[in-house]
Amino acid sequence: MARQGRYGRMSRGSTIVEFAIALLVFVTLLVAIIEFGWLFFIQHTLQYATREGTRLALVGRTVNDPSGNPMTRVDSIIRTIRDASSLAVRPDAVLISIYPVSASFGDPANWENIQDAGEPGDYMRVRTRVVHTFFTPLIGGFFPDGRITLQAEGTYRNELFDE
């Protein structure tokens, strides 16, 4: 039978304590990877949806609603963006602004509330925003109210399409 050393009694259970500390660090890193992975997925999807909306917008095309009726250009752009972003976020959570930009490519006043698809040849901007709430307070604690606003935009020139 092996004899316990002088410190044998004091080291009893130290393995489980070390494992618990290592597990805590590992789980924290795993949660952070999942949280930020989801955040980047939403950002990428929002950028993709914005690009899809601008592609439709710049050629002056429209889409049909579910019952087959043609939609306006603005509604077509909004629907395209919401459909393309629906995998990552609720479609109604995406805030969409469509507006003409000035010659200096500056934003007009109150651009957040504008939805105007513009005329042929106009320089336009589509800006989308969504508020992301983190799943865990562990990561959310680093952000105000545990949320962050993700934004994507596309600037383009309308082609000289027939209206």
Regions found by a protein language model. Give the residues of each.
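Short, conserved structural patches
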Residues: 2-3, 51-163
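Alpha-helical assembly-interface signal, strongest on the long, hydrophobic N-terminal helix that forms
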Residues: 2-81
